[in-house]
Amino acid sequence: MPSRAYHEGLWQAVPAGLAPSDLDLRRRFLLAHVDPGMRVLDVGCGEGAFAAALARAGAQVVGIDAAEEPLRRARARHPELDLRLVDGEGEWSLPDAGFDAVWAGEVIEHVADTAAWLSEVRRVLRSGGALLLSTPAVGRLTLLRMALSRRAFEVRFDPRGEHLRHYAPGTLRGLLEDFGFHGVQVRSAGGVPGERHVLLARAVRSRF
């Protein structure tokens, strides 16, 4: 199980957060699926950029993160937001079925116990609510480089790296379906054809 030091270390490694173009790509995807008045949980809210965008769009937002450093930055920039520190791998102190949507931007690849994490997402989502997430993609050109170069493979899948897991569209879709989500949509975005760098997914929580 990753320690709090692991999560804090991620934010020391990326002090500036996402690049503006990457931020905009994910923000447009997120806001396309959220309506005013919806109750939205931002999991791994980081510096609060997405939570702030959701609030401006009229959503009722709660942001949670497993690291104190990004929350400190977020509270300084967005004091109006409801932002909370949680155990990254344990149960969140949030009500059952309390949200219409859960957003997790660049989070699932850092989760050691994916089964427990998805079970917690299901618990806090209402029946019929949507999970929206983004995660880095492994493009075809990257796969080709890894097939041709042992060094490229080792760098990408170094267990000491910041990503604990890597997902392809099919594996992400299958994982979400296995955990009781339906209508799963996964698409590659960003970058160039053959080397898309992000997966964007939407999945609906089943009633059972």
Question: Which ranges hold each PLM region?
Answer:
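Conserved N-terminal segment of class I S-adenosyl-L-methionine
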Residues: 1-95, 101-105, 118, 157, ...
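A short glycine-rich, Lys/Arg-flanked "PGG" loop and its adjoining helix->strand segment in the class I
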Residues: 116-127
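Short N-terminal helix/helix-N-cap motif within the alpha/beta-hydrolase-1
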Residues: 69, 112-116, 143
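Short glycine-centered segments of the SAM/dcSAM-binding site in methyltransferase folds
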Residues: 39, 128-130
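A short hydrophobic/small-residue beta-strand
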Residues: 61, 131-132
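A short His-aromatic
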Residues: 106-110
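Conserved class I S-adenosyl-L-methionine
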Residues: 132-154
